A protein has these predicted regions:
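Conserved Nudix-box catalytic region and its N-terminal flanking loop in Nudix hydrolases
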Residues: 23-62
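Active-site-adjacent beta-strand/loop module that shapes the phosphate/pyrophosphate-binding cleft
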Residues: 67-69, 77-99, 109
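Conserved hydrophobic "DFG−1" position in protein kinase catalytic cores
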Residues: 18-19, 26, 93-95, 110
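Conserved N-terminal beta-strand and adjoining loop/helix that marks the start
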Residues: 2-24, 45, 76
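NUDIX/MutT-family hydrolases
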Residues: 92, 101-132
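Hydrophobic packing within well-folded, soluble alpha/beta domains
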Residues: 52-61, 73, 91, 108
C-alpha cells in the first residue's frame, strides 16, 4: 500500500547540535529505521502542544538518556521525499551529563567539524554542517 504524504502540513522536527570542546555528537540511525545507518544530529518530532525546546529535551532524553542545555536555534530547513515531509529546526546544545545510553541508534561518534565530510548524513543534516 502506498503511503500518502501531506505536502501542505509538514511535520516539525528538532535536532540537537551537541558540542563539547571542538567536537560534535553524531548519531548513527538504527539499521531497521528509515534512512538506516546514516548519521544525524539526534532529535525527533515535535508533539502537539510542545515547544521546540521541550521536544528536543524529551527526544534527547529518550534517545541518549541524557539531559541537555539548549542555546540558540541556528537553522531551519525543509525536507520532503516520498516518505516524509518535515521542517527541521536545528539548535546548538551541550550535555548536562555524559552518561549516554543509546536506545534508538546504532552508535555515536564525537567528530570534529573538518571531519563531517567523512560521514554519510541523512538529507538536511549534511547541509547544515556548513553553518556550524
Amino acid at each position: 500500500m502506498k503511503k500518502l504524504i501531506n505536502t501542505l502540513n509538514p511535520t516539525d522536527v528538532v535536532a540537537a547540535i551537541i558540542k563539547k570542546d571542538d567536537f560534535y555528537l553524531l548519531a548513527k540511525r538504527n539499521k531497521d529505521k528509515y534512512m538506516g545507518l546514516k548519521w544525524e544530529f539526534p532529535g525527533g518530532k515535535v508533539e502537539e502542544n510542545e515547544t521546540f525546546k521541550e521536544a528536543l529535551s524529551r527526544e534527547i532524553l529518550e534517545e541518549l538518556s541524557v539531559n541537555i542545555d539548549i542555546y540558540n536555534k541556528i537553522a531551519e530547513e525543509r525536507y520532503q521525499d516520498s516518505e516524509i515531509n518535515v521542517i527541521l529546526h536545528y539548535f546548538i546544545c551541550s550535555l548536562k551529563n555524559e552518561d549516554i545510553v543509546l536506545s534508538e541508534h546504532e552508535a555515536i561518534n564525537w567528530v570534529k567539524k573538518e571531519d563531517f565530510n567523512k560521514y554519510d548524513f541523512v538529507p538536511g543534516d549534511g547541509d547544515i554542517t556548513s553553518l556550524i
